Amino acid sequence: MAKLENPILMAKIGGAQGLRGEVRVSTYTDDPMALGDYGNLVTADGRVFEILEVREGKNVVVVRFRGINDRNAAESLNGLELFIERDNLPDDELDDDEFYYADLEGLEAVDAEGKSYGAVSAVYDFGAGDLLELKGAGRRPALIPFSEAAVLEIDLEAGRILIDPMAAGLIDNPDDKDQNGMSPFGKK
C-alpha cells in the first residue's frame, strides 16, 4: 500500500476487455499511450498497479496490469481512479504559458488592486475553453474563463493569479448599463 502526498488523477478504469485481465482505461494525459511513462499508478486506497502493456482501443486505451490475469480480476477494477505523485510529472517539458491543472488549484485570484475573488478550487475543460472555478469565504462559487483576457498573470511562487474581474464576468461593465441603470443581465 502506498499513500501519495500530492496525488494527480491520471486515469479511470472502465470495464474488462477480453478474457486475459485487460481493462479499458480513460486517461487524462496529453498522450493516452504514454500512461505507462509516469511509473506505477496508485488508487485512493493505496493499491499500486504496474502497467505491463498499453495499446489503443476505441476512445480509450487497453491496459494490462501485473497480477491481473483474468476477466474476473479485471472486472473488480471497474471504476477505480488511478493517481501518480505530482513530482512524477515532467515540469521541464512545459512552455512558460503552460500549467498543470493541479498547480492552479489553491491559487488566490486577485485583481490589480489586490481584491480577492476567492481561490481556484477546480479547473474544467468542457471543450470550448477551460474554466476556473473560484471559491471564497462568503461568496458563491464562480466560473471564469481561463483566457488571456480574464487571467492576466499566473504566479505559482506567490500563490496567486491576477485577473481582470470585468473580462472574467465577475463584475459588470458600467458602460453597459442602460438609462435606467440596468445591466444586460437585469442587475442594477
Curated annotation (Swiss-Prot):
Q: Name one GO biological process term.
A: ribosomal small subunit biogenesis
- Pfam families per the record? PRC, RimM
Q: Any idea which GO molecular function terms this record carries?
A: ribosome binding
GO (cellular component) term, any one: ribosome
Note whether rRNA processing occurs among the keywords. Answer: yes
Q: Please tell me whether the keyword Phosphoprotein is annotated for this protein.
A: no
Keyword annotations for this protein? Chaperone, Cytoplasm, Ribosome biogenesis, rRNA processing
What residue range is the signal peptide?
A: none
For the PRC barrel domain, which residue ranges apply?
96-169
Its main subcellular localisation, reduced to a broad class, is: cytoplasm
Compartment list: Cytoplasm
Q: Which domain of life is it from?
A: Bacteria
> Per its database record, what is this protein's job?
An accessory protein needed during the final step in the assembly of 30S ribosomal subunit, possibly for assembly of the head region. Essential for efficient processing of 16S rRNA. May be needed both before and after RbfA during the maturation of 16S rRNA. It has affinity for free ribosomal 30S subunits but not for 70S ribosomes.
Its quaternary organisation is: Binds ribosomal protein uS19.
- Family statement: Belongs to the RimM family.
The UniProt comment on domains reads:
The PRC barrel domain binds ribosomal protein uS19.
| PANTHER family, per database record | RIBOSOME MATURATION FACTOR RIMM
What is the protein name stated in its UniProt record? Ribosome maturation factor RimM
Q: What is the lineage of its organism?
A: Bacteria, Pseudomonadati, Pseudomonadota, Alphaproteobacteria, Hyphomicrobiales
